[in-house]
Amino acid sequence: MKKILLVLAFFITIVTSAYPQLGNNNMTLLANIDNHTVPYSALWGYKDANDGREYAIIGTFDGTSFVDITDPGNIHEVGFVPSTSPGNSNNLWREMKTYSHYAYIVSEVGNSGIQIVDLQYLPDSVHYVKKFLAAGHSSTHSISQEGPYLYLNGSNGGFGSGVVVMDLADPENPVKRGSYNNYYVHDCRVKNDTIYAANIYDSRVSIIKATNKNSLSLITSFINLPNSGPHNTAVTSDSKYILVTDEIGNTPRQLKIWNREDLGNITFVTGWQPTGITTTIIHNVETYGNYALIAHYEAGIRLVDITNKSNPVEVAWYDTYPSTNSLDYEGCWGVYMFPSGKIIGSDRNTGLYVLKTTFNVKMAIEGFYNSVLNTMISGDTVKAYLRNSSSPYNIADSSAAVIDAISLTAKFNFFNAAAGNYYLIVSHRNSLETWSGNPVVYNPMGFNTYDFTDSQSKAYGNNMKSIDTSPVRYGVFSGDVNKDQSIDLSDLGMIDNDASNFSIGYIPSDVNGDNVADLSDITITENNAFNFITIIRP
């Protein structure tokens, strides 16, 4: 049954507890596409170097699907390449990577080889080049890539069950170079001509020198204790740490972080698993700067801040398999993040998920805030803008979200701004537009936060009002009813007119959020007008 769920980009993520079966946190679902025969398997991403369009590539039971995810409101399949053995019961999964404008797909089914797909004709279509079989090659469990080289992992025994290097100097006709077969390799990652191989059945991780592609050599290996069953690896951007996922073995099957700065003494740093969950299986991890993006089977997609390697902090998640958390191999298989910050994940049963982490802004509206309850009387919609940090401060991106009355947090989605420093501006329907005290660092490939409430200096020119002393909180000024960037007699006139007419409902003149225009709204606005409150911006 074909099922495509598209969610508008301004959809607000539901905030719940740390247990993923109870909800999702700090991730917005943009689309869930499930229109192929299950089970689904691995996925990868491809960004067109010419036009910047983004594509998800996801393995299905009967082939590989190519999905354009560029426009959050129009996510759709643009191509499909059938399996070399469709319907074969041994062909339940496939893995893929990209190089230049080509995708390379492998599977464990016999005689599957490497499927080569030309992506240069996107967004119109994909072009299937051929199935490539090197001498002695039949099947491969997983595939990795760095530069113009593929690394085939866990291929058929006669070809190389460890790691085999394929040269892509001619992308449509790979050439076998060297191999390393001391142990079976389930998966690997390659960084700076160094292979980090997961030897799942030998409970170890091997670090292999691949500077000479014709002659791979072991640098060192270590036992991935405790409860070892290393499925895949990832390496931090500074190459100082190795992240390892334990798919098999005793529980907990968790993420492990190892310090590899001294290759003669690789040391265990810490283990991590989702808060409150010990019964799900970790599968794949990818690293992006100071973040680890994890496919955690029935616990779904998890984003973990690994800035402090000794204390990883989970900052966002989306549970693709909310019905249970068990030791079954269901749920999320693979994950990938684009430079835009879009996250894709594959669920074995429900297909492709496209997500985006939110930019969480904590703020309070003066008129709506109750200092006795330390909450706002109600939530309300706020617009947020990212403006360039230098004159003329052009708008780079914008979003809208609802402030939660209890947490005072609004969760925004930005899709256009690149990584950089921006002024953050918040604008409410009858409050004064407020700029951040300084440009804020925005990283689309991470989780971003800003708190206006904890210091007056968080607003440019200290342009906020003290609204609570315990806890100390500051709020944006209320009363700019006509949105002319100052609070003055013209705003008072509008409120007075509505109050005289006993106006009620969701109206601009309702400054305190009680759905009535009356004396209390006039009082708030009059105080700010008396103090000549106006916008302060660079």
What residues fall within each predicted segment?
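Structured interaction patches on ligand/partner-binding surfaces of diverse proteins
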Residues: 402-403, 431-467
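Bacterial Sec-dependent N-terminal signal peptides
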Residues: 1-23, 359-362
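Feature marking well-ordered beta-strand scaffolds used for ligand recognition
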Residues: 19-358
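Alpha-helical segments with a strong preference for the paired helices of cellulosomal dockerin domains
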Residues: 351, 459-470, 481-508, 512-538
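Short, acidic Ser/Thr/Gly-rich low-complexity loop/linker segments typical of extracellular
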Residues: 390-408
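Short amphipathic, basic-aromatic surface patches that mediate peripheral association
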Residues: 359-377
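Short Pro-Gly-centered beta-turn/loop motif in secreted/extracellular proteins
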Residues: 407-422, 430
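Short coil-to-beta strand junction motifs in C2/discoidin
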Residues: 59, 374-382, 419
